[in-house]
């Protein structure tokens, strides 16, 4: 019989729940707690979360939802665990009894062969320090609602002696400088968002195809890295630097009421093409930004006055169609912006957002397509 503290067991199970929350019907064992090698594992087909948990070397799998719900409701401070042997084969376990005080439950053991096969490649090693602004940098750099599967995700990339985290959806490049060195990798942004729910990672390690993020209490979040070959981050950053060097035609801070106004006129927003989704035409003038949308036989517009000083270096009309989702997402993160003429021949403009260590490029759509 094994006796463990209830609090420690509940904390351990709770810390690995991100590995079962999204389960995977295609993998047997995606809904399990796997106890193996004195660690507790979960794996949902995409990510694995594990934490040290002494179980005298025993290996077994139990339905995660049921075990967590039962142990979490126990009143006593300790939990007892006993293994029931198979009568026909004493070398095998048939079930596990979990009891505390006068409350007891028996859990059938699950087949863990498939989940163990996927976890064979996981090898733990001493991690390198993770930059202290990694979570904040990801929150700013990530691009939500990315409609291009091959671009979806975030990458870390090195330019000179600096490391950046970057994302792109072909119409926008979003970049944030990290406060420290980090090896290069690409991971799915939804997966990384789950990892950061565990808190701020202290260490990271790349072992084979896996990225490991280490947290307090020796909790480890593991996920499979993605192919970086279609994400040329250095070229993207070079393109951004080139645009930032252009003299802006408009420069200032976005009006605080821009988001609400865009929300109102978006009711009549149409789709420009498959790369953009819903679009809005922005016209920059000294009075403010005029947001205009059209769909079928209707249209809507609203003038959003400036609420701070804005610099203009041209008397020409500065006007372009922009993806609504991209504009709102970038504008919700930083309010400082520049507008530069990216292609004088076509009179197309690029919108540049700038924070202390954050930059984002939002490409304009110079010709409205049907």
Language model segments and positions:
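Structural preference for solvent-exposed beta-strand-turn elements
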Residues: 1-370
């Amino acid at each position: 019989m094994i006796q463990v503290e209830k609090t420690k067991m509940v904390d351990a199970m709770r810390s690995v729940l991100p590995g079962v929350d999204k389960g995977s019907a295609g993998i047997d064992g995606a809904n399990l707690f796997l106890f193996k090698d004195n660690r507790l594992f979960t794996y949902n087909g995409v990510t694995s979360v594990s934490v040290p948990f002494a179980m005298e070397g025993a290996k077994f799998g139990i339905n995660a939802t049921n075990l967590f719900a039962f142990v979490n409701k126990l009143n006593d401070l300790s939990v007892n665990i006993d293994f029931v042997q198979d009568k026909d084969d004493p070398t095998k376990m048939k079930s596990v009894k979990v009891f505390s005080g006068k409350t007891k439950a028996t859990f059938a053991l699950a087949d863990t062969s498939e989940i163990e096969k996927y976890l064979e490649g996981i090898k733990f090693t001493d991690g390198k320090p993770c930059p202290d602004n990694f979570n904040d940098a990801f929150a700013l750099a990530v691009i939500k609602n990315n409609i291009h599967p091959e671009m979806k995700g975030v990458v870390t990339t090195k330019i000179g002696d600096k490391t950046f985290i970057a994302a792109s959806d072909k119409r926008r490049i979003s970049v944030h400088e990290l406060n420290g060195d980090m090896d290069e990798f690409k991971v799915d942004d939804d997966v990384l968002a789950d990892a950061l729910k565990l808190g701020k990672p202290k260490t990271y390690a790349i072992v084979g195809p896996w990225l490991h993020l280490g947290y307090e209490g020796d909790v480890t979040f593991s996920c499979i890295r993605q192919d970086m070959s279609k994400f040329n981050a250095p070229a993207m950053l070079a393109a951004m630097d080139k645009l930032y060097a252009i003299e802006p035609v408009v420069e200032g801070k976005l009006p605080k009421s821009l988001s609400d106004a865009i929300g109102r006129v978006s009711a009549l927003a149409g789709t420009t093409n498959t790369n953009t989704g819903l679009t809005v035409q922005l016209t920059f003038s000294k009075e403010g930004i005029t947001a205009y949308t059209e769909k079928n036989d209707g249209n809507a517009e609203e003038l959003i006055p400036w609420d701070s000083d804005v610099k203009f270096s041209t008397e020409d009309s500065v006007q372009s169609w922009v993806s609504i989702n991209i504009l709102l997402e970038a504008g919700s993160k930083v309010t400082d912006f520049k507008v530069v003429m990216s292609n004088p021949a076509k009179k197309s403009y690029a919108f540049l957002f700038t924070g202390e260590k954050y930059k984002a490029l939002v490409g304009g759509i110079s010709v409205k397509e049907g």
